[in-house]
């Protein structure tokens, strides 16, 4: 399964923050999943791609986050995984998360990087968020 993320997204590692573009193409990279376990992934530059920009407003704090990704990323909404989130949906990134309301979804064309899983894992941390990724069947 391949998921594209915009080139301005960062991946939070346990002791570091790295731009996706700093990963070496074709090399195995270890990144943490939602449980804090490390998983192997491959990164590849995919050129200019049409991506979605999701603007999220925290339900209880004065905080706004922007995530740029392809629409095949699965989000957790009220305990259900879905890809077709809409404006007004509330997404959560872990069990203790109070929730983020989707306030805007727009299209953008950006430099994009693909993330391919070497071991079939289903989650990745991008911009501090857990994004679920399903394997193609």
Which role fits each region the language model picked out?
Residues 1-137:
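Autoprocessing domains of the Hint superfamily
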């Amino acid at each position: 399964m391949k998921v594209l993320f915009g080139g301005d997204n960062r991946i939070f590692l346990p002791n570091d923050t790295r731009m996706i573009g700093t990963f070496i193409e074709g090399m195995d990279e270890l990144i943490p999943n939602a449980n804090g376990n490390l998983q192997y992934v491959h990164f590849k530059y995919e050129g200019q791609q049409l991506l979605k920009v999701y603007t999220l407003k925290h339900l209880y704090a004065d905080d706004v986050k922007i995530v740029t990704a392809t629409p095949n990323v699965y989000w957790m909404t009220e305990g259900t995984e879905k890809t077709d989130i809409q404006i007004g949906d509330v997404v959560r990134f872990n069990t203790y998360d109070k929730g983020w309301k989707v306030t805007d979804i727009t299209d953008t064309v950006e430099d994009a990087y693909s993330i391919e899983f070497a071991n079939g894992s289903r989650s990745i941390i991008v911009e501090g968020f857990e994004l679920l990724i399903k394997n193609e069947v």
